[in-house]
UniProtKB/Swiss-Prot annotation:
This is SsrA-binding protein. InterPro entries: SmpB (IPR023620), SsrA-bd_prot (IPR000037), SsrA-bd_prot_CS (IPR020081). The gene is smpB. The lineage of its organism: Bacteria, Pseudomonadati, Campylobacterota, Epsilonproteobacteria, Nautiliales. Keywords: Cytoplasm, RNA-binding. GO terms for molecular function: RNA binding. It is found in: Cytoplasm. Required for rescue of stalled ribosomes mediated by trans-translation. Binds to transfer-messenger RNA (tmRNA), required for stable association of tmRNA with ribosomes. tmRNA and SmpB together mimic tRNA shape, replacing the anticodon stem-loop with SmpB. tmRNA is encoded by the ssrA gene; the 2 termini fold to resemble tRNA(Ala) and it encodes a 'tag peptide', a short internal open reading frame. During trans-translation Ala-aminoacylated tmRNA acts like a tRNA, entering the A-site of stalled ribosomes, displacing the stalled mRNA. GO terms for biological process: trans-translation. Belongs to the SmpB family. SUPFAM superfamilies: Small protein B (SmpB).
Length: 150
């Protein structure tokens, strides 16, 4: 599994409850751009349109070596491919207040197919963000102390 992009802001702003692997409907030049690492997941989100999941705000840069006459929109909504049961479960959860779906990372699986890991998330409050930051610092210090002790 080759990870192309991660959404670090999602881990900071949200508490991830469940994770799902989704396929993407892409065009050829977009796949080439993803392989080149020209993708950004920051400020992207998943929304349901007529019962189908789409990812909005995912920026895939235009590749210079691609056809200059055919230039797709860099921030166009891209359809996600999930099983029907997963879609129904996510629609039910996101209809509740406070839940959202955010992209976590984009990668190529063993069969060289682009996959997007999405997560069912609940927003963190300022207090939760500070608490998780303190915990992260404490873990880092503990690891450093263990390293010194060896």
């Amino acid at each position: 599994m080759k990870v192309i992009a991660t959404n670090k802001k999602a881990f900071h702003d949200f508490e991830i409850l469940e994770r799902y692997e989704a396929g993407l409907v892409l065009q050829g030049s977009e796949v080439k751009a993803i392989r080149a690492g020209r993708v950004n997941l920051k400020d992207s989100f998943v929304k349901f349109v007529k019962g189908e999941p789409f990812v909005f705000g995912m920026h895939i840069s235009y590749l210079d070596s691609a056809n200059p006459h055919f230039r797709p929109d860099e921030k166009r909504p891209r359809k996600l491919l999930l099983h029907k049961k997963e879609i129904d479960k996510l629609i039910g959860k996101t209809s509740e207040k406070g839940y959202t779906i955010v992209p976590l990372k984009l990668y190529f699986n063993k069969k060289n197919i682009a996959k997007l890991e999405i997560g069912l998330a609940k927003g963190k409050t300022l207090h939760d963000k500070r608490e998780s930051l303190k915990k992260k610092i404490m873990d880092r210090e503990a690891r450093a102390a263990m390293k010194e002790y060896r």
